[in-house]
Amino acid sequence: ERGCPRILKQCKQDSDCPGECICMAHGFCG
């Protein structure tokens, strides 16, 4: 499992997201 905290965080780009999360198409980290 990758190091992505399970929090709902809005984003515009991957760097907006914590840990190893990426910015998904719906505009939230995942």
Curated annotation (Swiss-Prot):
Membrane-spanning residues: none
Membership in a protein family: Belongs to the protease inhibitor I7 (squash-type serine protease inhibitor) family.
Keyword Secreted: yes
Protein name: Trypsin inhibitor 3
Intrachain disulfide bonds: C4-C21, C11-C23, C17-C29
CDD domains membership: PlantTI (cd00150)
GO MF, any single term: serine-type endopeptidase inhibitor activity
Pfam families in alphabetical order: Squash
Source species taxonomy: Eukaryota, Viridiplantae, Streptophyta, Embryophyta, Tracheophyta
Intracellular or extracellular location(s): Secreted
Functional note: Inhibits trypsin.
Site (Reactive bond): R6, I7
Listed GO CC annotations: extracellular region
Keywords: Disulfide bond, Knottin, Protease inhibitor, Secreted, Serine protease inhibitor
Highest taxon of the lineage: Eukaryota
Major subcellular location class: secreted
Stored SUPFAM superfamilies: Plant inhibitors of proteinases and amylases
Domain writeup: The presence of a 'disulfide through disulfide knot' structurally defines this protein as a knottin.
SMART domains the UniProt entry points to: PTI (SM00286)
